[in-house]
Amino acid sequence: MATMITNLRRDLIEEIISRVPLRSMKAVRLTCKSWNNISKSEIFTKMQIDKATTREGKTMMISVMPHNLSLMSVAVDDVDPSVEFKGQLSFLCNQVSIHKVIHCEGLLLCFLKDHTRVVVWNPYSGQTRWVKLRYPHPPSPSKWDWFRYALGYEDKGSCRSVKFLRFLDYLPEEPENQNVCYEIYDFDSDLWTTLDVTSHSWICYSSCGVFLKGNAYWPVVKSSSEANIDHIIYFDFTRESFGPPLPLPFGATDRGYSYVNLSCVKEEKLAAFFQHYISYKYEFEIWVTTKIEAEMVSWSKFLRMDLGPNIDIPITFFIDEEKKVFMGFEHREYPKRFINIIGEAKYLRKLDLQVPQGQYCCPPLCSYVPSSIQIKKPALRQKDRAK
């Protein structure tokens, strides 16, 4: 008599299901109640995440397009690097038009063409949470969104309390009429809170904060200075306040780089990319933190190169410390989209992402590691309970 898969021991079922590609987990959960419960268990989640994050030589990324998000892997080597699309991630519906995405340890904060709300999504678990904004985010005359954003969480014992930070520290189109605003949304309480940050005197030069170990980081410059970017500043999601500015590496700032971008390295370190806009525009440096605490940071140089007119300033970048490889996304050859892969030996490979013409979001790529973080559903309000 043949044995049905549903009659197998639970540990065998967990092992089998853990081999299912992440993009197909929604179908697994819908198969039966038992499989749905298994897929949500802590043991199974750790098993599948370990399998997804230890594929040899591959970096998992999400390609962002207006109506869909696609999971892909990038195999990095100095002979034949390649990109492989794993398939489209199931979102809410094709009518949801995505404008921008922020990644935080497996959670995606998705901004829509509908400027009145955002949605936080865990592609691994399929959980979503819609958040209504207090007011739309593009307030400037040009409709450019000058708000800064970050998604993060506070550790509360065995669980994590997800929070969404949104602030406006400078409006360059109206320098004489500055109306700063700092607010945070708590997923546990389902409430927005206005933060008292009246003495904040640093201007962030990136719209999206990079999350690392409970804090979100931005490159900044003194609001009263016209100097180059020489510090980073962080927001502590537990204390719900900004910490002191931390210096960028002097070895880079003394060269007068005018462009700085940040990235997270394996959820453990920060990487900083430096490049000139005009002079020495083909030279760039990347530094990585060796230690980062509340009031101090130390850096180590990862890479410095001059590649001539081969690469443009990357919108997003990633590094592989073990392989000494830099991956940067450029948009110079629009409508085509490329990842530049650069190694320590100064080799350069361009990988065409084959993004359909006219489909563009910012950032167009984000790194991805599956996460078991639970997105709490909003509590029923009194009027909802009465229905």
From Swiss-Prot:
What top-level branch of life does the organism fall under? Eukaryota
Disulphide bonds in the chain = none
Q: Which InterPro entries does the protein's record reference?
A: F-box-assoc_dom_typ1, F-box-assoc_interact_dom, F-box-like_dom_sf, F-box_dom, SCF_F-box_component
Q: Which SUPFAM superfamilies match?
A: F-box domain
Positions of transmembrane segments = none
Extent of the signal sequence: none
Q: What are the residue boundaries of the F-box domain, all occurrences included?
A: 2-47
Pfam families named in the record: F-box (PF00646), FBA_1 (PF07734)
Protein name, as recorded: F-box protein At5g41490
